[in-house]
């Protein structure tokens, strides 16, 4: 059975998972945030097979998450996060935060570079500053929201 593509799905979550939903792609992006730039660095830090790494890097470049940057004075290139790729930082940190809450050791603490203090956990906040739990929120059709906002 052929795998269904969600590349053009209406749902932004489905489209996002189509782009970065496999484990290797997410870990490659994580390593790019950690400073890996060269093929060999990704290969070594992740322990991933070359053929898998090649396919995932090509996909991330094609999606505009990574870009190939020439290495000055060399025929080689490096991989760098694009603006679109850097936008995944919040997503990765949210997944990390969820994983921390599921138990197990946490070898790293996320800190503010300026003062080295731990960063507050991610949370959703209402327009008035209240922290919102999952049961405090709902998705409504954008068209319905627009009509309701115009009536106010």
What are these regions (language model features)?
Residues 11-49:
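N-terminal helix-turn-helix DNA-binding core of bacterial DNA-binding proteins
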Residues 21, 72-92:
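Basic, amphipathic "hinge/linker" alpha-helix immediately C-terminal to the N-terminal HTH DNA-binding motif
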Residues 93, 97-152:
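C-terminal regulatory/oligomerization modules of transcriptional regulators
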Residues 1-7:
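A detector for short, charged/polar N-terminal pre-domain segments
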Residues 16, 26, 63, 91-102:
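Alpha-helical linker/hinge and terminal dimerization helices associated
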Residues 39, 43-68, 75:
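Canonical helix-turn-helix DNA-binding module
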């Amino acid at each position: 059975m052929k795998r269904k593509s969600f590349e053009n799905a209406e749902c932004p979550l489905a489209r996002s998972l189509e782009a970065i939903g496999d484990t290797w792609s997410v870990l490659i992006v994580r390593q790019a945030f950690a400073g890996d730039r060269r093929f060999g660095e990704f290969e070594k830090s992740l322990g991933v097979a070359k053929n898998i790494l090649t396919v995932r890097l090509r996909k991330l470049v094609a999606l505009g998450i990574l870009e190939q940057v020439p290495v000055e004075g060399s025929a080689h290139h490096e991989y760098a996060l694009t603006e679109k790729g850097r936008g995944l930082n919040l997503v990765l940190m949210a997944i990390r935060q969820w994983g921390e809450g599921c138990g197990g050791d946490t070898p790293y603490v996320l800190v503010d570079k300026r003062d080295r203090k731990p960063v507050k956990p991610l949370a959703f906040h209402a327009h008035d500053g209240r922290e919102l739990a999952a049961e405090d929120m709902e998705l409504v059709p954008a068209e319905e929201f627009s009509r309701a906002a115009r009536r106010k």
